[in-house]
Amino acid sequence: MHRKGAIGIGTLIVFIAMVLVAAVAAGVIIGTAGYLQQKAQATGMQTTQEVSSGIKIINIYGYVNSSVPSNGTITKMAIFVSPNAGSGGISLSNVKIVLSDGKKLVVYNYSKGLLYDKQISDLFNDSIVTIWNNITDTTFGIAVINDSGNKMDKDYPNLEWGDTVALLLRTTVFETEDNRRGIGPGTRIVGKVIPEVGAAGVIDFTTPSTYNYRVMVLQ
């Protein structure tokens, strides 16, 4: 009887141990499943944000620095942009503009305070859009075309759905074959307008073979 009782107690102990092990294992599995689910949800949200967010390029205009356009080069550029459909707010202070003529690649950054939000009668005129005077070869300024959310702070401008701005930059860092500063005729320019999150706006155009106007549509 004592032997049978001992065997019964031993079996009970083994059974309890098995139950405890199973419970611990189940807890680990449930915890892991919960972690993986949360991670998958976070990844899904991030992917959705990446796909839906981004910058759309509307038009690109170039400005020739000569009263006789055929004798000049493009020394200023205005890139008109707005958010993609479904995009969240885009911090323009974190946007990068990349341009290349095949010989040189330039990265432009926003310089705090270079934002113009008044009426525009001549976009490329330094005396009217005065921020041109402080735009360097590697910085860009912002001219506000439409600010639906009134969030275009000079230091931290935010581009939201319904907004349109022109990103203003100088192209005098490029040189023609005859060593003139600016972008000459028949030059292919490629690049991107890259937001911190979301799809980049693609730049890809070739300048006209002859410049007939001081202001021209490039893309």
UniProtKB/Swiss-Prot annotation:
It is found in: Archaeal flagellum. Its main location: other. GO terms for biological process: archaeal or bacterial-type flagellum-dependent cell motility. InterPro entries: Flagellin/pilin_N_arc, Flagellin_arc. It comes from the Archaea. Residues 1-5 form a propeptide. Keywords: Archaeal flagellum. Pfam families: Arch_flagellin. Transmembrane segments: none annotated. Coiled coil: none annotated. One of its GO terms (cellular component) is archaeal-type flagellum. GO terms for molecular function: structural molecule activity. Flagellin is the subunit protein which polymerizes to form the filaments of archaeal flagella. PANTHER family: FLAGELLIN B1. Belongs to the archaeal flagellin family. This is Flagellin B4. It comes from Pyrococcus abyssi (strain GE5 / Orsay). The gene is flaB4.
